[in-house]
């Protein structure tokens, strides 16, 4: 029962003469929570709340987290060896500890995310694409690729700068020349030498 970009759906339900409404989970947004139910009951509609509530809240977990914390839900993905290392020695080529199944799961996580964030070290070491790949992923959107690069070390010929499949956002400590950046690349300045993740999440 909230006026936002669209009018309240409660008015449409009452106007249509709907006699019964089943709600799996209450709206997690505290500014509107409960108002729609009250309006429907006052309009003579039979309202049931809580059917498959756990399943509904799981589907809305990202949105519910944002409503509560006003920050995006963060999922960390890491592959390590038996000693807890995520890569081999810097003097050797980049190592991959992931199995085929873990790679599939990684792309499933990417497909459910709005952005993928890495540090400049990952870009320099691996030259990743940070796109969603896999035959079973389905037609989902490609997340924004975010690189924390305070000192503008990103190579102009790396995949994130050359590949236009998804937008690339560079988080930097100062303004740098962006006149040669392709259209899919955007730069944002957070004026701190060591950029805290909290500042990025608050953007």
Model-inferred region functions:
Residues 25, 60, 90:
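Short, flexible helix/strand-to-coil boundary loops that buttress conserved ligand/catalytic motifs
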Residues 1-2, 9-10, 65-67, 71-203:
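Active-site ligand-binding patch in enzyme domains
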Residues 34, 39-42, 61, 68, ...:
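Short, surface-exposed, charged/polar-biased interaction segments
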Residues 30-31, 57, 155, 178:
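Generic structural signal for helix capping and beta-alpha/helix-loop junctions
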Residues 52-67:
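Short, structured interface segments
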Residues 1-56, 193-195:
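Zn2+-dependent cytidine deaminase-like catalytic core
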